[in-house]
Amino acid sequence: MKTHKIFWLNLAAIIIISIVVSGGMFLAMKWEQIHLKDGLKKVLSTYPIKNLETLYEIDGHDNPHYENNDQDTWYIESSYSVVGSDELLKEDRMLLKVDKNTHKITGEYDTTTNDRKDATDSTYKSYPVKVVNNKIVFTKDVKDPALKQKIENNQFLIQSGDLTSILNSNDLKVTHDPTTDYYNLSGKLSNDNPNVKQLKRRYNIPSNASTKVELKGMSDLKGNNHQDQKLYFYFSSPGKNQIIYKESLTYNKLSEH
């Protein structure tokens, strides 16, 4: 009887210890996620950059390969892609080069269309652009008025989005490597998120499409300056092609391009 009682006491102790340890680990993980989200909020709160020309005066992350007197370049890129079963069907891409040395912003708007029935039938067009007084203008004449309006009205999420609202989602996982300053955020966003609303309205994405988000970049998570980052939105609907929106902001040395 005594042995039986000791067995149950030991078992109860093991269960209690397991619960306490598990609870402690859960709270530690929960606290770590809160801490990382707070750090990312500092980074994302530096947006929006409503006027792209202010990037002339903004430095990117510190890089030991750059000299102190180097004049560097920001690259801003966005793309909207329609993807079928393992194949790209359509892509619109905007790439801008913000030259801090010449104080000029130049780039191109590309469109790619692939025929699902004929893999050899692919259409690619490129339209050179520049930014003047924070407005995108063409450097060559474009005859299609709808396309012209579409490109001239193009805006990046770093200009018009509410990036900090991404962190309001309860379905996110954030990781950060303090030795390399590399961070990664991934999870799901609701249809109420303002960035999701903006993209769905802009690209006529089905309102019921589910949205996954991924954010990658380099930062010490202290919000000291703008950092290299890549942002991905994945829109999926049953029986529909997947839609992917990508946007990136990178800071590079002129001599490397």
UniProtKB/Swiss-Prot annotation:
TM ranges: 6-26
> What compartments host this protein?
Cell membrane
- The main place the protein resides is membrane
Task: Give the signal peptide range.
Answer: none
One GO cellular component term noted in the UniProt record for this chain: plasma membrane
Keywords attached to this Swiss-Prot or TrEMBL record, sorted alphabetically, are: Cell membrane, Membrane, Transmembrane, Transmembrane helix
Supply the name of the protein.
Uncharacterized protein SAV0210
Give the species.
Answer: Staphylococcus aureus (strain Mu50 / ATCC 700699)
